[in-house]
């Protein structure tokens, strides 16, 4: 499989290493600013790359969105999470002409976590729910896109849910519809996501811990391996 990388930060550098270990070929990289240290052919536009089978994006909205407005016909795996609503609308539009895969978290374990959560929420309807995520001290956005995904699962199953981000400003007891959302930043934490169900005299915790960023890179590669054989459409872990 011949892969075009959109962005060449820490994550796509991992994609390149792991993809080549699997026998795939990196045919080029698209970056905001060409760099002499990038060990692959650099391009400005997706359509300029003639021999790629798929593009894998681990970049940011500033790089990705202008590319999506261009005309190209390359299967696309997207891991950028910024400006999610705008991004999903654009990817849905593109999926009429190319196969597109999107996930806010490329770990299949996190996908499994969302399924476990969907099963637990109706069973624990009278339990309070708190969501916590922890990441390294260089992560700039909070809460994480994955935590937002977990929150969306809860919203789809419970009515009148209220997100609570900063409880120290509230001078009132917890309300039944509250969903606490907490972010921790420190050290080199790869990524941890926890759902706490707190009931009377008992608690249940569901946790996913990433032990290496390789899980996200491998997830993107595995998605690409499947996507290249798919017809045009919008794909997630649910239908890939």
Curated annotation (Swiss-Prot):
Example GO biological process: lysine biosynthetic process via diaminopimelate
Keyword hit for Cell membrane: no
Protein's UniProt name: 4-hydroxy-tetrahydrodipicolinate reductase
Function, in words: Catalyzes the conversion of 4-hydroxy-tetrahydrodipicolinate (HTPA) to tetrahydrodipicolinate.
Reactions it catalyzes: (S)-2,3,4,5-tetrahydrodipicolinate + NAD(+) + H2O = (2S,4S)-4-hydroxy-2,3,4,5-tetrahydrodipicolinate + NADH + H(+); (S)-2,3,4,5-tetrahydrodipicolinate + NADP(+) + H2O = (2S,4S)-4-hydroxy-2,3,4,5-tetrahydrodipicolinate + NADPH + H(+)
One Gene Ontology CC term in the entry: cytosol
Binding-site residues for NAD(+), renumbered to this chain: 79-81, 103-106
EC number per UniProt: 1.17.1.8
UniProt entry keywords in alphabetical sequence: Amino-acid biosynthesis, Cytoplasm, Diaminopimelate biosynthesis, Lysine biosynthesis, NAD, NADP, Oxidoreductase
